[in-house]
């Protein structure tokens, strides 16, 4: 199993031409994003309460689920 933070995974998603790619760009642009965390609750709370994230939380939920699958391989 891989040992990468959510932020490290998100950097692999940048450049996609979909909502997940746009969220990855917003996370990249947010200098205060918790780059070393991988806990769903910490990350979702941050996205809900900080920064100027414009996409629905369902995009984050889907991206986090993809992250957990990515960690397995």
Swiss-Prot record:
For this protein, the record's Pfam families field holds: YozE_SAM_like
Family (UniProt): Belongs to the UPF0346 family.
Name of this protein: UPF0346 protein MW1311
| UniProt organism field | Staphylococcus aureus (strain MW2)
Question: Taxonomic classification, please?
Answer: Bacteria, Bacillati, Bacillota, Bacilli, Bacillales
């Amino acid at each position: 199993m891989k040992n990468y933070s959510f932020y490290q995974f998100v950097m692999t998603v940048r450049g996609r031409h979909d909502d997940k790619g746009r969220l990855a760009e917003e996370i990249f642009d947010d200098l205060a994003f918790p780059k070393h965390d991988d806990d769903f609750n910490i990350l979702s709370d941050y996205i809900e309460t900080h920064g100027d994230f414009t996409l629905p939380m369902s995009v984050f939920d889907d991206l986090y689920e993809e992250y957990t699958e990515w960690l397995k391989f």
